[in-house]
Swiss-Prot record:
Gene responsible for this protein: fbp
Localization: Cytoplasm
Assembly with partners or alone: Homotetramer.
PROSITE patterns: FBPASE (PS00124)
Residues that bind Mg(2+) 1: 90, 109, 111
The organism of origin for this protein: Nitrobacter vulgaris
Name this protein carries in UniProt: Fructose-1,6-bisphosphatase class 1
Catalysed reactions, semicolon-separated: beta-D-fructose 1,6-bisphosphate + H2O = beta-D-fructose 6-phosphate + phosphate
């Protein structure tokens, strides 16, 4: 791997003369250029007029910040003149049909984790590229396994772009001097087993039994069935959690729970599908607990599903608890439960 290999050079080598791959290359290049501009905005913060103030709510009911709106427009402007059949943004209610005869469709979350803006924590952009179906209106009513490419950008201490074209996962870092992304991690592999988990533990009382039982196993540490101690992480930014898992392994859980409006978890089109594609391409797993995320065919642009992703053995253990109820019941038995820090 050359430290000087740019994203453009990498994409040129992948695309060749194939028209479909050429379209993907152009879209990824445009998204990367947009990411540089968004990175500039996040770095300047209040100096660029970014206040983190709410601008209302988007289609999904999430509070929409000023940078959400600006990031959305930057990406739309970057993609608008390319051979793209349709665009879908988390910030918009409906599909934006551009050129139905074009070979690809692009979905994106322009600014994941925007609630972190005021606290100077990591935010990011997530994207998914699909082939155009015969009915362009069904562009994102396809299984996640149909994706041609997926990626995300983390705007943190460094700006990193994670990309899969369905043939492994690469990481590119923004060289601010040249304003281009350069390859810094090739064929990334997630450790098969790790002792970190990420979940918003304040919602424990709302989780279903398998999730509670799994987290209690982790908290029992070396004294429990896992036989080792675990660390908990929670940043509140999906892109930051995913990047850490790519580097160190572990498991991320955003389960559906009993709270009104939170029964179903993360957005399929804008979050779960692209993240699942990336994680699987890096040797990890992504599941709802009962079903592989990439097998899900969403029936709407803003459908949600529980999202569990990370090191394959960790994910498989939680899947086992969902599919074999007695395992979760046994793990939640009083003798074991007394060891859990969250038992009430």
């Amino acid at each position: 791997m050359s430290q000087e290999l740019t994203l453009q050079q990498r994409m040129d080598g992948e695309a060749g003369s194939d028209p479909l791959r050429q379209a993907v290359k152009e879209a990824v290049a445009a998204l990367a250029r947009a990411a540089v501009d968004i990175s500039d905005l996040t770095c300047r913060g209040a100096l660029a007029g970014i206040t983190g103030q709410a601008q209302g709510r988007n289609t999904d009911g999430d509070i929409q910040k000023d940078l959400d709106v600006r990031a959305d427009q930057i990406i739309r402007d970057a993609l608008g003149k390319l051979p793209i059949a349709a665009l879908a943004s988390e910030e918009m209610a409906d599909l934006d049909i551009l050129n139905p005869a074009a070979p690809i469709c692009v979905a994106f979350d322009p600014l994941d984790g925007s609630s972190n803006i005021n606290t100077n924590m990591s935010v990011g952009t997530i994207f998914s590229i699909m082939p155009t179906p015969s009915d362009v209106n069904a562009a994102f009513r396809q299984a996640g396994s149909a994706q041609l490419a997926a990626g995300f950008v983390v705007y943190g201490p460094q700006t990193s772009l994670v990309l899969t074209l369905g043939r492994g996962v690469d990481i590119f870092t923004l060289d601010r001097a040249d304003r281009v992304f350069k390859l810094t991690g090739s064929s990334v592999q997630i450790p098969t087993d790790a002792n970190e988990f990420a979940i918003n533990a304040s919602n424990r009382r709302h989780w279903d039994l398998p999730v509670r039982a799994y987290i209690d196993e982790c908290l029992a540490g070396a004294d429990g069935p896992c036989g080792k101690n675990f660390n908990m992480r929670w940043i509140g930014s999906l892109v930051a959690e995913a990047f850490r898992i790519l580097i160190r392994g572990g498991i991320f859980l955003y389960p559906g729970d009993a709270r009104d409006g939170y029964e179903e978890g993360r957005l399929v089109v804008y979050e779960a599908h692209p993240m699942a594609f990336i994680v699987e391409q890096a040797g990890g797993g992504a599941s709802t607990g009962r079903k592989r995320v990439l097998d899900i065919v969403p029936d709407s642009l803003h459908q949600r599903v529980p999202l569990i992703m990370g090191s394959i053995k960790n994910v498989q253990r939680l899947e086992h608890m969902h599919t074999v109820p007695d395992v979760a019941l046994e793990a939640n038995a009083p003798l074991f439960g007394n060891r859990g820090l969250f038992r009430v």
